[in-house]
Swiss-Prot record:
Homodimer. The lineage of its organism: Bacteria, Pseudomonadati, Pseudomonadota, Alphaproteobacteria, Hyphomicrobiales. It holds the Pfam family PNPOx_N. Its EC number is 1.4.3.5. It catalyses: pyridoxamine 5'-phosphate + O2 + H2O = pyridoxal 5'-phosphate + H2O2 + NH4(+); pyridoxine 5'-phosphate + O2 = pyridoxal 5'-phosphate + H2O2. Pathway: Cofactor metabolism; pyridoxal 5'-phosphate salvage; pyridoxal 5'-phosphate from pyridoxamine 5'-phosphate: step 1/1; Cofactor metabolism; pyridoxal 5'-phosphate salvage; pyridoxal 5'-phosphate from pyridoxine 5'-phosphate: step 1/1. This is Pyridoxine/pyridoxamine 5'-phosphate oxidase. Substrate binds at residues 60, 117, 121, 125, 185-187. Binds 1 FMN per subunit.
Amino acid sequence: MNDVTTATDESGIFTSEDPIALFHEWMELARAKEPEDANAMALATADASGFPDVRMVLLKEADARGFVFYTNLESAKGLELKENSRAALCFHWKSLRRQVRVRGDVIPVSKEEADAYFATRARDSQIGAWASKQSRPLAGRFELEKQVAVFAAKFGVSRVPRPDHWSGFRVVPRHIEFWRDRPFRLHDRLVFEREKPAEAWRTKKLFP
């Protein structure tokens, strides 16, 4: 049973029955209030044995299809997502005293999407994507700088193509929770849930 109307009446912050629209409302507020990187999110993954891992990444796109980030596919997170294609995200905006948590299945973005985003990156970042063997042992800073120089010379002034080992993932949400801090830890929590992308969202409130 949907409970959004009741939640809106009580708190005044759950203003949409569409969790993606509500997320964008909160993100716009965060962009106005947070000093930098309002789109930073904790990405939690697990390997095939279930051992968890977490790190901060940047959200690059969010729409009805899901939440997109980009990475080296040979990194720890890339390999973990290959073994276990589920993940969780957490956005925390301290200035707003709000957070959003997402859980869902993870699918790769299309080559066309990855190419289009890669083309928008700074040239030095594009070269860095070729130079960095992300998450693998590094003898010293010089080794990385040497690789950067190698690929900078290779591409010269020509266009830097996207390497095959660099692309993006889309977290297709099954569960999205909106949380707002309240006095005495009597926080507001609203959850949107569904099993499949084609299903309608179900909502419920949770005890803090």
